[in-house]
A protein has these predicted regions:
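Catalytic toxin/effector domains delivered as secreted proteins or via bacterial secretion systems
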Residues: 21-24, 31-35
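Low-complexity intrinsically disordered segments
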Residues: 32-178
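Short, extreme N-terminal segment that most often corresponds to the first beta-strand
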Residues: 1-25
Length: 178
């Protein structure tokens, strides 16, 4: 069996917790980590838009990750869906405020994109679900590949998408998820 994931956002200012079930415009989207952690995935893009200039604690919680402190909070509710969006990470940075680091999205995309042979299609694994996942490696469909040991490295950290990195933060774009 494969492990399925839901996304949890926690706003420290308002204390609001949101649990997302990966539905986009009331349509089911694939739930395994490797199935939906793609650059142009509409669900992941909608989550990025929700944290645009609004830091949240972010966690992609697997249904096998029962050691997670809010496992029941995530898996005992249906969760909410998102609306499709045109939001993209072009020209933006993914910021981890707890660690005072950022990932330059344009650089990351250029380093990690892969072209389908004989096609113009570009594939790139999205760093946000991978960096914030808990439970990876326990089911089929989980990420196994380059920098696998870094999956979950930003789990439940305070993260936002910004146009510019904060001045005193360090560039950590050297992630290779392929």
């Amino acid at each position: 069996m494969g492990q399925y994931y839901k996304t949890r956002l926690f706003n420290e200012e308002t204390k609001e917790v949101l649990v997302f079930n990966r539905r986009v415009d009331d349509e089911y989207t694939w739930g395994k980590l490797r199935e939906h952690s793609w650059w142009f995935n509409p669900f992941v893009n909608a989550i990025c838009e929700k944290i645009y200039e609004k830091p949240h604690r972010v966690a992609w919680v697997g249904d096998y990750a029962d050691e997670c402190e809010f496992y029941e909070e995530v898996w005992n509710v249906d969760g909410i869906g998102v609306k499709s969006t045109d939001f993209l990470l072009d020209g933006k940075v993914l910021v981890n405020h707890d660690r005072k680091i950022y990932l330059d999205c344009d650089k990351y995309f250029k380093m990690n994109r892969v072209y389908d042979k004989g096609k113009l299609t570009v594939w790139c694994l999205h760093p946000l679900p991978l960096l914030t996942a808990i439970g990876n490696g326990r089911g089929s469909g989980d990420y196994r590949g380059t920098d696998e040991n870094l999956v979950g490295d930003w789990y439940n950290d305070l993260i936002s998408v910004e146009m510019q990195p904060p001045l005193d933060y360090k560039d950590c774009t050297d992630y290779h998820f392929k």
